[in-house]
A protein has these predicted regions:
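An extended, acidic
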Residues: 54-177
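DPxDG-like acidic metal-binding loop motif
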Residues: 1-47
Length: 177
């Protein structure tokens, strides 16, 4: 959401994740435009403005509403990402959305607005808070290992857990590796 913020696009958030001994134990994502605050603490559930949230119940990829992020200009995966987008677009009934804020995209999966999200080459600090919020809302997040050693970039799939394997199986193998 940094580029959105810098360019006046109202889709960005303040996102803070707290990690202790290698585990994220709390997180908060604040959307100042909509005045929405997502937060979670390990074992305490996930909330949106003090109301408990849960992921959606959709269990088929075809019926799912998905969101993704786009490739950076210097991404080695750029060509494959567009191919992947097209492949998944041909599976799902609803159009795939792209808003440009990883933190909000994960938060929106956590509260059931979307059923799944995937993106490659994210910075950890952009998704740390979303990890605990999604898990506490009943979702699943998977980190896909990069071939780049010691990379700060993260490849993730975040879902309601019911469509996770189907989405993972639909992504292009060359982008996962």
């Amino acid at each position: 959401g940094t580029l959105n913020f810098l360019n006046g696009v109202p889709q960005f958030a303040i996102s803070i994740g707290y990690e202790e001994k290698g585990e994220i134990i709390s997180g908060i994502i604040f959307d100042p435009i909509k005045d929405e605050m997502f937060f979670a603490e390990k074992g305490g559930g996930a909330f949106l403005n003090n109301s408990r949230i849960r992921v959606s119940n959709k269990n088929k990829l075809k019926d799912s509403y998905l969101v993704t992020g786009g490739p950076k200009a210097d991404s080695k995966k750029r060509e494959g990402i567009f191919e992947e987008y097209t492949k998944i677009s041909n599976i799902v009934d609803a159009p795939i959305r792209k808003f440009g804020s990883a933190a909000l995209d994960i938060a929106n999966v956590a509260c059931g607005r979307f059923d799944g999200y995937w993106q490659w080459e994210l910075k950890y600090w952009d998704i740390a808070a979303g990890i605990i919020i999604l898990k506490e809302a009943g979702g699943f997040i998977e980190f896909i290992e990069s071939n780049e050693k010691n990379s700060l970039k993260k490849n993730i799939i975040a879902t309601n857990s019911k469509i996770h394997q189907e989405l993972m199986g639909s992504l292009l193998k060359k982008n996962i590796e």
